[in-house]
Amino acid sequence: MYRRWHGEFQLLIDIKTEGASTYRELDLRLRRYRHLFTTYAHGKVRRSAVTAVISGDRAARVPMEAQRVRRAFYDGRLADLGSAAPASFIPLISDNWSLNFTWQGVGPIPPAERQKLRGIVSTAHKRGQRVRFWATPDLAGPQREAVWGELLAAGVDHLNTDDLAGLQRFLDARGR
């Protein structure tokens, strides 16, 4: 982190192996750098420079929920939106765009899908959660830009892409 930078950095860790055992090992490693990581302890969140959010294999949830002190948070799904799990455990709601929306950027977004998207974002934000979708169109072109535009207009917090330069051009063109 930069010496005079006071923002937050989200480290999204995508577990591709068995979640519970991988998370337990990761937790041991995060403890070595406890001064860097946002921490949940006994019902309270203490912010720090880096907030680790665990994504990927869902089995990581069980050991995480059992911890009274942890240096990582859980990446929820749309099914978690409105659940009893608080934002102090699930600060991020992520899901597969293609499984939840039929619109892929061709023509205007159907009004019902725009309303659904905005409802998801509104509900999450009221709960103190951020929103991200993966599996959005990611080939350069008008379809991708149309989807990104709708995501921004709806207030989605994270745009998921493998084309960082393309995203930067898109955001720069919109003064973001």
Model-flagged regions — what are they?
Residues 1-176:
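Catalytic cores of phosphodiester-bond hydrolases, prominently lipid phosphodiesterases
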